[in-house]
Amino acid sequence: MKRIGLTGNIGCGKSTVAQMFRELGAYVLDADKLIHSFYRKGHPVYEEVVKTFGKGILDEEGNIDRKKLADIVFKDEEKLRKLEEITHRALYKEIEKITKNLSEDTLFILEASLLVEKGTYKNYDKLIVVYAPYEVCKERAIKRGMSEEDFERRWKKQMPIEEKVKYADYVIDNSGSIEETYKQVKKVYEELTRDP
C-alpha cells in the first residue's frame, strides 16, 4: 500500500483536491474531520479536552464548541500544543487501525494541514502540496464564513506556502479553474498508481 500525505495551507483547496483523488479511486482520510469526530460526547478525546480546557468550551447541549476552543488555543502556543498532543495521539492510533484493514494495492492519502510543520510527512511515501497564492486562499476562506482576523491568525501558524512546496514530491496548483486542477490531480493519481 502506498501512503501519501496531502497538505497545503488554509484556503488552498486541499479538500477539493482530496475529493478528486477520492473520485479517482484513492482511499482518502481527512485528518481534520476525523479529529472533529473525536470531540463527540463519550469519546476519550472529548473527556480529555474538556478536562484540560474546562467546561467553558462547551455549548448549551454540552458539546465542544470548536469556535470557543479555537479562540483559546490559537491565542496561546502552549494550549495549542497541548490540544494537538491530545488529538494527534488519537489520530495516529486511528490511522493505524484504518490502514491495517486496507488491501495492499490501495492508494491511501491522508489530508492534513500540518504534515510539514510537524515533520509527519516523513511517515509517508510521497507528499503532495496543494498550492494557491495568499490572496486566493484568503478570499476562499472568507467566502466560507471565516473572519479576516481568524484567517490571518491561522495563516501565520502555518509555514509559508512557498516554503512548504519545497518539501513536495508533487505540487497541485489550485489557483486556476477546477478543470485545470483536475488535470493535475489525474496525472499525479496515474503516476502514483502506475509506479510499483
Curated annotation (Swiss-Prot):
GO molecular function per UniProt: ATP binding; dephospho-CoA kinase activity
This protein's record includes keyword Cytoplasm: yes
Enzyme Commission numbers on file: 2.7.1.24
Alphabetical keyword list: ATP-binding, Coenzyme A biosynthesis, Cytoplasm, Kinase, Nucleotide-binding, Transferase
Ranges where the DPCK domain occurs: 3-196
UniProt GO BP: coenzyme A biosynthetic process
Keyword ATP-binding applies: yes
Gene3D superfamilies associated with the record: P-loop containing nucleotide triphosphate hydrolases
Enzyme type, top EC level: transferase
GO cellular component: cytoplasm
Family annotation (InterPro entries): Depp_CoAkinase, P-loop_NTPase
Pfam families named in the record: CoaE
Catalyses which reaction(s): 3'-dephospho-CoA + ATP = ADP + CoA + H(+)
PANTHER family registered for this protein in UniProt: BIFUNCTIONAL COENZYME A SYNTHASE-RELATED, DEPHOSPHO-COA KINASE-RELATED
Role description: Catalyzes the phosphorylation of the 3'-hydroxyl group of dephosphocoenzyme A to form coenzyme A.
Name by which UniProt lists this protein: Dephospho-CoA kinase
Gene name per UniProt: coaE
